[in-house]
Swiss-Prot record:
EC primary class: isomerase
PTM (free text): Phosphorylated.
Organism annotation: Human papillomavirus 35
Stretches that traverse the bilayer: none
SUPFAM superfamilies linked to this entry: Origin of replication-binding domain, RBD-like, P-loop containing nucleoside triphosphate hydrolases
Keywords carried by this UniProt record: ATP-binding, DNA replication, DNA-binding, Early protein, Helicase, Host nucleus, Hydrolase, Isomerase, Isopeptide bond, Nucleotide-binding, Phosphoprotein, Ubl conjugation
InterPro entries: Helicase_SF3_DNA-vir, P-loop_NTPase, PPV_DNA_helicase_E1_C, PPV_DNA_helicase_E1_N, PPV_E1_DBD, PPV_E1_DBD_sf, Rep_E1_papillomaV, Znf_lg_T-Ag_D1_dom_sf
UniProt similarity note: Belongs to the papillomaviridae E1 protein family.
Name by which UniProt lists this protein: Replication protein E1
Superkingdom as given in the UniProt entry: Viruses
Amino acid sequence: MADPAGTDEGEGTGCNGWFFVEAVVSRRTGDPVSEDENEDDCDRGEDMVDFINDTDILNIQAETETAQALFHAQEEQTHKEAVQVLKRKYASSPLSSVSLCVNNNISPRLKAICIENKNTAAKRRLFELPDSGYGNSEVEIQQIQQVEGHDTVEQCSMGSGDSITSSSDERHDETPTRDIIQILKCSNANAAMLAKFKELFGISFTELIRPFKSDKSTCTDWCVAAFGIAPSVAESLKTLIKPYCLYIHIQCLSCSWGMVILALLRFKCAKNRTTIEKLLSKLLCISAASMLIQPPKLRSTPAALYWFKTAMSNISEVDGETPEWIQRQTVLQHSFNDAIFDLSEMVQWAYDNDFIDDSDIAYKYAQLAETNSNACAFLKSNSQAKIVKDCATMCRHYKRAEKREMTMSQWIKRRCEKVDDDGDWRDIVRFLRYQQVDFVAFLSALKNFLHGVPKKNCILIYGAPNTGKSLFGMSLMHFLQGAIISYVNSKSHFWLQPLYDAKIAMLDDATSPCWAYIDQYLRNALDGNPISLDVKHKALVQLKCPPLLITSNINAGKDDRWPYLHSRVVVFTFHNEFPFDKNGNPVYGLNDKNWKSFFSRTWCRLNLHEEEDKENDGDAFPAFKCVSGQNTRTLRD
């Protein structure tokens, strides 16, 4: 048979072989027992401790414990790396803080030298990260900034025990310029200057100014607070800045920072904040960061009273005429005048200046607030939009009624009075002759046209393009303030509404569809007879159609498509192209001055006679007044 596995017949040392047992007999039976020996030792089995060999079992346990320790060490290393990544992501480096602190305090010049752009702006985070509880245990940064009356302390300490400290005794030996530089290093230099200003002057700087966000906004009046000025420079400021200003109000106080100046300046021309910063930095020898520059409050009575009262005291140096906005709010007479707003005065102003548009009235009247007490009261009102709308509405009513009361002769005379200069009527005559128009026939047609003679109420200027038809007609409409209608709006029911308020009207560049519309709907309008117009927000209005001037490239007076218009239009043909000189200017001046001269010269030929019955003042239509008159009280003996 085969030998059993693992058995070696030659030697008995295998696991299945024979064992050699050697017994050592230390004491035989019957030997006497010594007194020093303990009889119970044999019973404890101490001599059998190493009887069983457990070396292999201990080796296996050691290997298991080593593997567990290695796994634990690897897990601990992994966790440390994860925590370190989070610290690098959310916590600042202590070494960088230390280097920044050391550089800022030891070498400010080294701090100014930088090759790369450093963006120190704070990032906006959606959620605020909670404190992890892990601080900079190896290196600690402590920055203490204390701003008090005379002491300024900045401390930067590290965990190793090194520190850089500035004592109060050293601060007293430094110049005021150094003190103000240290103050400006605070996190909010503007707040520090505002606090120091209120401490010195007893009033907040923001109560005296109205802030301008843009540095490019211009203004003539500016309020300036400057800090850290040398005493000699502060005393000479009034003399240095006088050539640039119309009004100077300067207050000067001293503190631990140096001299502090509060100035109200009115410059000779409007300036922006950037220009003033450059000027004052040059005159006061300080940086722009140590100045507060804003325009003053112009409509604040407490602010005006502050400037008014301090100007009379001995703490201020004043030169020049007091600004009107201070006088208006401090002098008793101006206060009474600003109390009540009168709408009729505003309407009278708009009527006299021919303002009928809401925007023009609001803008122009607001500009009068500095000189007109009623305009100032208008700006103080909370219903400016309603006032402007009511003013424009009333002005249009007065203008419309006045125009209806005037005859054509009176209207032309009124328009001539609006033109100041006298022109040359010959330019218009030369232009008509250049276009081969009989001047006598034109005067006869113009006379019937202005008087609205039936069948002669419409003049057609016909000709090729670029012959000056529109220029001739538009210049006449501009002088007589006529209305313009356009066929492009013919789909609307109200496209003829401008005829409602017009003394004369014009339709430019009539085409075939336009002539077809006129032939179908406006024959009686060309006759000069009463027509019915659809006007917005009103019932149908009946009125006599004003004289109508039409320009066209189609001769409707001879076109067979519209035979009923042949007797209703008076046609003048322009044959030649409008001439210009080498500079591109018109050879013939068709403007208001020449039209004024033309009507003055042909006044009798056009049968434009004035009314014989005039008022007592010698004028058929005296100046319109919508304000109540002031009664004059006489003194009696």
